[in-house]
Curated annotation (Swiss-Prot):
GO biological process, one term: mRNA splicing, via spliceosome
Family designation: Belongs to the YTHDF family. YTHDF1 subfamily.
Superkingdom assignment: Eukaryota
The species this protein was found in: Cryphonectria parasitica (strain ATCC 38755 / EP155)
CC terms in the record's Gene Ontology section: nucleoplasm
Matches recorded under PROSITE patterns: YTH
Name this protein carries in UniProt: YTH domain-containing family protein 1
Lineage: Eukaryota, Fungi, Dikarya, Ascomycota, Pezizomycotina
Biased composition (Polar residues): 49-61, 251-260, 273-289
Pfam families per record: YTH (PF04146)
Gene: YTH1
Length: 549
């Protein structure tokens, strides 16, 4: 509406001055519009805006601007039905031109001439550029591993630091603590550090020293020492936990019979013990910090103790599924002697399995053979091949000596959140001792990272046969209140790989599995069958009464 058409008003209702102050704007159709779409063309807008190319004058007397040689055109939506995002095309293009075939380059936007520095020499050429997705609908298709990429071999046990027998717990660490920064700090304060295991999510660490004297000295010097902007807390790692009444709860099975009363509930005095009770740490297979491993079985097996129970950890649920199909398992080297001894002296050895960070027990099985010592029978660990996107095997990073810190190496097992440093030993070439588990992967060249395909990253485990009795999942919260007197009277969910359960506690835990049959069925395969077995078909351990409350 022009100004002359505005009716004259008097007084406060005269809006002529306001109308003159407002900018004038016109609506025009696009030059190639088929009549179904309008363009809003404000006055004074830049002619280079995509979709606003003007070939006719906007104001009277203004000459036509003509076509812009470097102007990009926006395709209407009705021409984009087979494309995931709008594409921009450089150079003058009419709507009658056939649409270029972009099917061979999905998700790659096309930039016109305006992105080239010398567009005069290339009046109608465009380049493809790989670009980060700019729209929600645009994006690279998710990486889907081929069906045959699922490995039929388990990944093997995790790496653990050397256990000297003299360890301290270091707490109150800052968040995002760097491992080597802490190692350098400990070595500056005290001598004799053998290994240091960092637990980032608990803001604490375990440090092993070569002897008792250096361990005591380090504990005194590290306590209240300033690290970055905080004061550290250090305590000796003990094998026993003393209760409020002065009664010491054993950390391993004693020579007493299972019929004896369970020690009263103890009060945890170490901060790490309180952090271990959290659910997010309960299913993590943290290394044993003390040098003398927790006793996994009684020195003398009582004649009445015909059943033994152990908790075994797995790196992944897939490894357990494979064991269900094959009936074979392999454990860490420091567990082999205890399992073999239990199999020879007890009538039944029951193994309760849990995958790390799963928050539940996978199931339980019965050991039906001793561990095979024949090297030819060893089973392969770790996937046969690793792609670039699946670099989750443990890495070994050497560290050079400094003024205070000796030469060592970092073991980074990011797949399970494990990282530690240990000193380099001169006798490492003589072989791995019984206390030190075999490496989970072969040595890798840092330049190739083991990804060149010429060599396979593998290690070997000693297998034994087992019979799966149940793969009914048992969440940890259903075991609340069930404590193991052979593990400092902690809850059964807090256990390392190879922890033995007191027989009466083991029977109760298996009873919880059988009570879970009324709950929704297991999510994984069972005994190699394509379908789940009904609760009535589940086998109950021989001689056990029905589940009880």
């Amino acid at each position: 509406m022009s100004q002359s058409q505005v009716p004259s008003r008097a007084g406060h209702y005269n809006m002529t001055a306001l109308a003159n102050a407002l900018p004038q704007a016109n609506y025009r159709q696009a030059p190639w519009n088929n009549g179904s779409q309008m363009r809003y063309n404000p006055a004074g807008a830049s002619p280079n805006v995509v979709g606003q190319t003007q070939s006719s004058p906007q104001y009277n007397g203004q000459p036509g601007m003509g076509s812009m040689p470097n102007q990009g055109y926006y395709m209407p939506q009705q021409q984009q039905q087979q494309q995931q995002m709008p594409q921009y095309y450089g150079g003058p293009m009419s709507p009658s031109q056939p649409q270029p075939n972009m099917s061979s380059r999905p998700n790659v936007p096309f930039y016109g001439n305006q992105v080239m520095s010398n567009h005069q020499a290339h009046p109608s050429m465009g380049y493809y550029y790989a670009q980060v997705p700019a729209y929600a609908l645009q994006g690279h298709p998710p990486h889907q591993a081929p069906v045959d990429s699922q490995s039929n071999v388990v990944r093997g046990p995790p790496r653990k630091p050397r256990q000297s027998g003299h360890a301290i717990w270091i707490g109150n660490l800052p968040s995002q603590t760097d491992l080597m920064s802490l190692v350098h700090h400990v070595c500056r304060e005290a001598q004799g550090l053998e290994s240091l295991f960092l637990i980032s999510k608990s803001n604490c660490a375990f440090a092993n020293f070569r002897d008792e004297a250096s361990c005591l000295t380090a504990q005194q010097k590290l306590h209240e020492s300033k690290f970055q902007s905080v004061r550290l807390v250090s305590r000796l790692r003990k094998n026993t936990v003393e209760g409020a009444s002065g009664i010491t709860a054993p950390t391993g099975p004693s020579a007493t019979t299972p019929q004896q009363a369970v020690a009263p509930e103890v009060k945890e005095i170490e901060q790490i013990d309180s952090t271990e009770t959290q659910s997010d740490n309960a299913d993590t297979d943290t290394p044993t910090a003390v040098g003398t491993p927790d006793a996994k079985g009684p020195a003398v097996v009582d004649a009445a103790q015909k059943d033994r129970f152990f908790v075994l950890k797995s790196l992944t649920v897939e490894d357990l599924d494979l064991s269900v199909r094959t009936g074979i398992w392999a454990t860490q080297s420091h567990n082999e002697e205890a399992l073999n001894s239990a199999f020879k002296n007890a009538e039944n050895v029951y193994l309760v399995f849990s995958a790390n960070k799963s928050g539940e027990y996978f199931g339980y099985a019965r050991m039906v053979s001793t561990i095979n010592e024949d090297p030819a029978a060893a089973i392969e660990f770790a996937p046969k091949a690793q792609s670039v996107n699946e670099v989750d095997l443990p890495r070994e990073i050497p560290t050079e000596p400094t003024k205070f810190t000796p030469k060592g190496r970092i073991i980074d097992d990011s797949a399970r959140g494990t990282i530690f440093w240990e000193i380099a030993r001169e006798d490492s070439s003589e072989g791995v001792t019984q206390e030190e588990p075999a490496p989970a992967v072969a040595e890798q060249d840092d330049t190739t990272g083991g990804l060149d395909g010429n060599s396979e990253n593998k290690t070997w485990g000693k297998p034994f046969k087992l019979e799966w009795l149940s793969t009914t999942r048992l969440p940890f919260y259903r075991c609340r209140g069930l404590r193991n007197p052979w593990n400092s009277n902690r809850e059964v969910k807090i256990a390392r790989d190879g922890t033995e359960l007191e027989p009466s506690v083991g029977r109760r835990l298996i009873g919880l599995f059988n009570r879970s049959h009324n709950s929704p069925g297991p999510r994984g395969p069972m005994m190699g069958m394509g379908q789940m077995m009904s609760p009535s078909q589940q086998q109950m351990p021989m001689g056990y009464p029905p589940p009880y409350s």
